[in-house]
Amino acid sequence: ILIGLVFTFVIYLPMAFVQSPLQLGILRFLLGFGAGALMPSVNSLLSKITPKEGVSRIFAYAQMCSNLGMVTGPLVGSAIAGYISYRAAIVGTSLFVIVNIIWSFINFRKYLRKRSIME
């Protein structure tokens, strides 16, 4: 998860400084790899740390939060882009990813040196 988040941050930040649609397209393409790394990692982590009787509920919450983010993210981002600039919206997203990296590191640091979360 941390590697996926760091990769996502490293891709998001340069998006604020692109000079052409081609540059933005390439970075957006690369961003797909970050999302591709995050979703399976999160799902795997949820299935391992959740008690068996709560797995269906936690996956429902995860899906609900994901869908909520897919709606509110573009709404907030477009409002910021409209009132300030696209650059501000992208930098804001980068800052949000940094907060997520810090939060994930704090909450999962005890697992960083283990081969499996189940150890």
UniProtKB/Swiss-Prot annotation:
Keywords: Cell membrane, Membrane, Transmembrane, Transmembrane helix, Transport. GO terms for molecular function: transmembrane transporter activity. It is found in: Cell membrane. Coiled coil: none annotated. One of its GO terms (cellular component) is plasma membrane. It is a multi-pass membrane protein. This is Multi-drug resistance efflux pump PmrA homolog. The chain crosses the membrane at residues 1-20, 22-42, 64-84, 88-108. It comes from the Bacteria. Belongs to the major facilitator superfamily. The gene is pmrA.
